UniProtKB/Swiss-Prot annotation:
Residues 628-639 have a biased composition (Basic residues). One of its GO terms (cellular component) is nucleus. One of its GO terms (biological process) is response to starvation. InterPro entries: STE12_transcription_factor, Znf_C2H2_sf, Znf_C2H2_type. This is Transcriptional regulator MNL1. Residues 1-34, 312-340, 383-419, 434-460, 525-544, 584-613, 625-671, 685-733, 885-905 are annotated as: Disordered. Keywords: Activator, DNA-binding, Metal-binding, Nucleus, Repeat, Transcription, Transcription regulation, Zinc, Zinc-finger. Residues 1-29, 584-598 have a biased composition (Polar residues). Residues 312-334, 439-460, 647-669, 690-710 have a biased composition (Low complexity).
Length: 905
């Protein structure tokens, strides 16, 4: 062994980079020589300063490397630089990028320093891996033979650091500056490499294409855990490593490691800032290959394509080679560490010990990481690539377990690999692309695996898919094409809208109504069948007018037997509004209660009566005269005859008994509406007055025959003050509150409208009184003292007529003045009280204006231009401004006319 030690001594002295020596020893096979290799490793460790074996004065210069190459028949450094056509280099500009979770990209030094180091270190590793197995007698012969084999092999040119050589069974991977990224259980590779790959050289299409795939992965897992005995687990733990090799401040690279790496952090070795990690369980070196570096952007798509073309022809040869390697591992400890250097062309689709390529639970869920996916440990910097590469499908832990969706994943992978990589990269941006090659008949939920120890049991079967469509769009409500359920789905047939709450659970032909994937991914694509259920078009709803604003939504919750005989209620149409002769537009079915008008017989009549028993007030009556100025014909309508009054009282009876189809013999025309199954009489100008009373009393109408007599008495009396019947209970308390408020306003409106009565000229003369200067018309209440106010202070003519309150209310002033406001009647802060109408005022001038304008009909203010009279001076002043503007306009027109005449002349 003297010559063996001499060779180690000479190699360690001639190397300027001790990290390559350390890597060469760490990559050796574990076996009976493990203790010897550990001693040699400790001798050449930089932490021991190499004081035991290396004499610093005897280290040669870099110019002596050529002699070393010539001694072992190895080409010089310049020749290997010329042979390497394409070298993948990193970009140091990414070092300034901030990474999440304190994880920085581990970048190599400059390009000029990295390239000689790669070529030098790689061939020294090739040479040093074979040294411990050389005998003293056969040392030089084996060395010359192997070096000549290396020189004759054209595949020895390495394109990328960290690649696998296919001609050697030893681990030839170079370790980068990052710590190993492993999980306690063995982490396997993914079948899809980086989606955002860029092909920069034609060199990638050659033989070592597979080598770049390992740079795109996370780590090289080891499968030696089950092949080593517990005694080897205990004896192989390196306890002699220096403890000062833990993560320290001298390490410029911030690292993130898993649970297994943190436990072994105290025993890690650093050689020139590089981390060499020794896995205590697998007993050979595992290096973390950067997935977040620039190397992950190169040549992944073409590599996938080359692997896809070669995998079918090489499948049998790879399986045979794997069996031979497994048999050799049991007999010779020399081949123990060669298990990780299997031919790596099977990692795309075949089941190998390195790469278990079982697909995920469903090929549709391409945007969702699985349980053992490395993406959940934040392996890459999120700023490097688009989010589609962060959600690639990963693989299962178990070798021989069949995948759940293996048939579809195999079929989809038989296409062009470059197109597969492209479509998977945009499958999360365009969610419908994930359904492109899936069969629609196999959308049932996946069956859980039978093994209880499977990590798939920890996954929930209905995990949420974070798709863009689920944010901006809702799930389309399918329309059932079954004829038996078509009537129950469409609520408003006229408008074409669909009430989604009342839709029954429709049976789907494929049986996937409970499948959560189908509900989210149910939007049809261009390759899906034409007969799939499409989302219904949105029909433009008609504008809701002022009178239908308070209409409650219609809820059709009827059994199927009732649906067969009753038709849904259509919305308001323009031809259903009644236009009176005076221009007053009113709606007569604004309460929202549907009427069931059919001719089915007695059963339908009973249903119609029960439906209309829940009455609501006529809220549209509050807006009866909004926005319309009343003219003289409306202000002084003619009286209503007794015959028309009786006909109006009989209307609810006839509509309740005949289902809204009865008619009368009045002078008006009969129109059938949807308001409480009653008919509306279109009045002629002679019966215009009764139309107002009809709207006032229509809120109390009922189609129930049991309540017809009480309603008849209620409508017949003028002093009817009873509240309307309570409306049906609704689901919203806010709607109930608003209805109560509107009902109270409606009651006050009915009080005022029910008291309207026509007076003749003789009756008005009898009711009014001629005032005198001594007649007290108002009193002032201040501190309990009543002060009388006479007419002399009001500046009224001596023959002024004073009208009572009833006539004032009947007057129907054109402007909205506060005639019966309760606050004016009960506010004690207003001390001036009118004895006629009991209204209070704060100032005496207000009382005078009120009395003169309302109680007297006197208009003392006259316009000198048009001789129009006004009851108030401010109204006269406002009127005079109109005349002033007209005069100014005439003057301006006259001036422009004179100017035009001068110009023409």
């Amino acid at each position: 062994m003297d010559s063996h030690n001499n060779i180690d001594q000479s190699v360690s002295e001639l190397l300027s980079d001790p990290a390559s020596v350390q890597q060469s020893y760490n990559s050796q096979l574990r076996g009976p020589e493990f203790d010897q290799q550990r001693q040699i490793r400790n001798q050449v460790s930089p932490f021991n300063k190499m004081t035991d074996t290396i004499d610093n004065d005897n280290i040669p210069l870099s110019s002596d490397y050529d002699k070393l190459y010539q001694q072992f028949s190895i080409p010089s450094q310049q020749q290997y630089e010329n042979n390497s056509d394409n070298v993948y280099k990193t970009n140091n500009d990414l070092a300034a990028l901030a990474s999440p979770l304190n994880m920085d990209l581990d970048l190599a030094p400059s390009d000029q320093q990295q390239q000689p180091q790669q070529s030098q270190q790689q061939f020294l590793n090739d040479f040093s891996n074979l040294q411990p197995h050389l005998n003293n007698s056969q040392e030089q012969v084996q060395l010359n033979g192997l070096t000549s084999n290396i020189l004759s092999n054209p595949q020895i040119t390495v394109n990328m650091p960290g690649a696998y050589h296919q001609n050697y069974n030893c681990d030839q991977m170079e370790i980068d500056d990052s710590p190993p990224f492993t999980i306690e259980s063995d982490l396997y590779f993914e079948q899809q490499t980086d989606n955002n790959s860029i092909v920069t050289s034609n060199r990638v299409h050659n033989q070592p294409d597979v080598e770049s795939m390992f740079n795109n992965q996370l780590s090289v897992p080891s499968l030696q855990r089950t092949e080593l005995s517990p005694q080897q687990h205990e004896t192989n733990v390196t306890t002699g490593r220096p403890q000062e090799s833990a993560f320290g401040s001298f390490d410029n690279n911030s690292r993130v490691s898993s649970f297994a790496n943190v436990n072994n952090a105290g025993t890690n070795l650093f050689v020139n800032g590089k981390d060499l990690y020794f896995d205590d369980e697998s007993h050979h070196r595992t290096g973390r290959l950067r997935n977040g570096s620039i190397d992950s952007y190169y040549a992944a798509n073409v590599i996938n394509h080359q692997l896809h073309l070669q995998q079918q022809t090489q499948a049998q040869a790879q399986a045979h080679q794997q069996q031979q390697q497994q048999s050799q591992q049991q007999h010779s400890p020399q081949d123990l560490a060669s298990h990780t250097s299997l031919p790596s062309k099977s990692i795309y689709n075949e089941l190998s010990p390195l790469t278990t390529t079982t697909s995920r639970a469903s090929s549709i869920q391409s945007g969702q990481p699985s349980f053992f996916s490395a993406q959940q440990y934040f392996s890459r910097n999120s700023m490097d690539q688009v989010p589609s590469s962060l959600h690639r499908p990963s693989f299962d832990l178990y070798n021989h377990r069949p995948s759940i969706d293996s048939q579809h994943s195999q079929q989809s992978q038989q296409r062009n690999a470059r197109y597969t990589s492209f479509t998977s990269s945009i499958s999360n941006i365009l969610p419908f692309m994930s359904e492109k090659n899936t069969n629609h008949n196999n959308r049932s939920p996946p069956t859980p695996p039978t093994s209880t120890s499977s990590p798939q049991n920890l996954l929930s079967s209905n995990q949420s898919r974070h798709l863009i469509r689920s944010i901006f769009k809702t799930n389309p409500t399918p329309i059932v094409s079954d004829a038996g359920n078509s009537n129950g789905n469409i609520v408003n047939g006229g408008s074409g809208t669909i009430d989604a709450e009342n839709l029954p659970d429709a049976p789907y032909a494929s049986g996937t109504i409970n499948d959560s994937e189908f509900l989210i991914l149910s939007s049809p694509t261009k390759e899906e069948p034409e007969d799939e259920l499409m989302q219904p078009k949105k029909v433009k709803k008609p504008k809701r007018s002022l009178f239908t604003r308070f209409k409650t939504p219609v809820k059709q919750e009827q059994p199927d037997s009732e649906m067969a005989v009753s038709a849904p209620v259509d919305e308001l149409k323009p031809d259903e509004t009644v236009i009176d002769m005076v221009g007053n537009i009113s709606s007569h079915h604004s309460s929202g209660t549907p009427s069931i008008t059919t001719g089915a017989g007695g059963n339908t009549l009973e249903h119609s009566i029960s439906e209309s028993s829940f009455q609501e007030p006529d809220y549209a009556a509050l807006f009866e005269n909004v926005g319309k100025r009343k003219n003289k014909s409306y202000r002084k309508p003619k009286g209503k005859t007794k015959e028309e009054e009786q006909q109006q009282q009989q209307l609810p009876l006839s509509s309740g008994t005949a289902g809204g189809t009865s008619s009368n013999n009045s002078t008006g025309t009969v129109e059938k509406t949807l308001f409480f199954n009653k008919t509306k009489i279109k009045k002629e100008p002679a019966s215009e007055r009764s139309s107002l009373l009809d709207n006032a009393s229509a809120g109390n109408a009922s189609a129930s025959s049991s309540e017809a007599s009480s309603i008849q008495n209620a409508i017949g009396s003028d002093d009817h003050n009873g509240p309307p019947l309570t409306s049906a209970p609704t689901s919203s308390t806010l709607a109930n509150a608003s209805k109560r408020i509107l009902s109270s306003k409606l009651i006050s409106k009915k009080k005022s409208t029910s008291k309207l009565k026509e007076y003749t000229a003789a009756e008005l003369e009898d009711m009014c009184t001629v005032s005198s200067l001594e007649t007290p018309v108002a009193t002032m209440i201040s501190k309990g003292i009543e002060v009388e106010v006479d007419l002399a202070s009001l500046d009224l003519p001596p023959d002024t007529k004073i009208f009572p309150t009833s006539i004032i209310n009947n007057k129907n002033r054109t402007r909205g003045r506060k005639e019966n406001k309760e606050a004016d009647l009960s506010d004690t802060s207003k001390i001036y009280l009118c004895n006629l109408c009991q209204r209070r005022f704060k100032r005496h001038e207000h009382l005078k204006r009120h009395f003169r304008s309302l109680h007297t009909f006197e208009k003392p203010y006259n316009c000198d231009i048009c001789h129009k009279k006004f009851s108030r001076s401010d109204n006269l002043n406002q009127h005079l401004k109109i005349h002033k503007q007209e005069d100014e306009k005439d003057c301006a027109d006259a001036e422009t006319g004179v100017g035009m005449d001068d110009a023409s002349g």
